[in-house]
Amino acid sequence: MIIRYYKPYTSGTRKRSVSNFSEITKSNPEKYLTFFVHRSKGRNSRGVITCRTLGGGHKRLYRRIEFKRNKLGILGKVISIEYDPNRNARIALIYYKNGDKSYIIHPFDLCVGNNIISDFFSPIKIGNSLPISKIPLGTIIHNVEFEPGKGGQIARAAGTFVQILANEGKFVTITMPSGEVRLLRRYCWATIGQVGNLDHSNVVLGKAGRNRWLGNKPTVRGVAMNPCDHPHGGGEGRSPIGRPKPVTPWGKPALGKKTRSPKRFSNKYIIRSRKMV
């Protein structure tokens, strides 16, 4: 991925940067692998706003991504690498020997023409999928399952990866993208390699309108509102919030309040918290 930087001819192009999409090999998606999804725009089923910072944005077709690599033992070939407006990673179109086609998350260094396979004893090669208990220690993986058979849920964003640290008994120790060290069941599946589009974090939007294209609305601070709109609002000039601790618009503690339950069943699987990194 190559990033193109704009010259500061206007305030909208100053510090603006975009990807040049050099890795994209096909512009139009497979028609039968896409469908339209009605976007909630931050509202619930009654039309009431439940998330004030979502809404608008360009229309999108959702691509069916194969997070659960269940075509066991069937060789697949990479036909194209495509842009997906629903995620920051690229997607790869795979053609299988049985005639099926599907999309997968595009790993870094997977090229058009490469072959991939999903099996219990797949070779350790980028794009191949197998149980994490069969993967050597230190290997970088992505699209990792939390629960066996549920499909990949961990490390699906651009540039993310998981690393295997230990393999003992019923569990495998991994390092999460956040730095958290935790245990996973040995029967969970994963895909070899790191998610592509590594430089996505270096892209600068440059103007507010570009954020609106993505469906994000402005986030207004509570202290900038009136007292009828937020507990932090009101006052003369630049005044403090007038409370011992910050709260949400509905008066509940915010900014530092712990939200994870100390009795959560999965706490026993966390060896080192991400906050200790």
From Swiss-Prot:
Compartment list: Plastid, Chloroplast
Keyword tags: Chloroplast, Plastid, Ribonucleoprotein, Ribosomal protein
Summary of subunit composition and partner proteins: Part of the 50S ribosomal subunit.
Organism: Euglena gracilis
GO aspect biological process, one term: mitochondrial translation
UniProt keyword Plastid, yes or no: yes
Annotated segments matching region Disordered: 225-277
UniProt KW Chloroplast keyword: yes
InterPro entries hit by this protein: NA-bd_OB-fold, Rib_uL2_dom2, Ribosomal_uL2, Ribosomal_uL2_bac/org-type, Ribosomal_uL2_C, Ribosomal_uL2_CS, Ribosomal_uL2_dom3, Ribosomal_uL2_RNA-bd_dom
GO molecular function: rRNA binding; structural constituent of ribosome; transferase activity
GO cellular component terms, A-Z: chloroplast; mitochondrial large ribosomal subunit
Name of the protein described by the UniProt record: Large ribosomal subunit protein uL2c
Stated family: Belongs to the universal ribosomal protein uL2 family.
